[in-house]
Amino acid sequence: MNLGKAGLTALAILMLASQGTSAPAAATVSGKVTLSGTAPKAKPLDLSKEPECVKMHAAEPLQPENVVVGPGNMLRNVVVYISGGLADETPVPPNAVMYDQQGCHYTTHVLAFRVGQEVKISNSDPFSHNIHPIAKINREWNKIQLPGTPPFSYAYDREEFIPVKCNIHSWMQGYFVVLRTSHFAVTGEDGRFMLPDLPPGRYTITAWHESYGTQTQEITITGTESQTLNFVFTAKP
């Protein structure tokens, strides 16, 4: 086949364009987080200061969520994230993350989101709440929300692990985990996490739990092959 000079030039341009649009190599790091030892025995929360809450949970008492384990002692509510090694990050998502006060508790106990990303806070209960994120690095604030009022939004400027409480209902507790990185996950009942789309490089991966602190591990990615990384926290005596 004789393409001629013009044909060869067009073919070269096409090949270069194809190379330029190919996706860079990326891998996935996944694993599980377990608790070694016996989890503390949970005592139902005392809701007696709010009779409506007592009625809501008459059939099934509301339990604390600071230490929750699933089958096989898999640990829930652990934030696993890239804490070192990433040079570039994706833009902050334009959509807000949702945080609701419903049934006398926070529907998401540990909510992780990006620095600069809005968190939209709702009150779905038929009574007032006063949400109070106790920030130390970012600005601390608290806001009362009457029943039936619209949600409000807030964004944080700096990375921080922020305890959240309700000034009206002392048993309502949670965490805002504000991260610079876009590579993070929060474990569910199965204790598993997945961090996809990691280009080749050396990374520090951190696992954080509100009761058991932090652990870090180093991992090197050389191509697109998936890797497994597990964390084990030790129960307190």
Predicted regions, residues:
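Positively charged n-region of N-terminal signal peptides that target proteins for export
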Residues: 1-6
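Extracytoplasmic copper-binding redox domains, predominantly the cupredoxin/blue-copper superfamily
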Residues: 20-237
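Bacterial N-terminal signal peptides
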Residues: 7-18
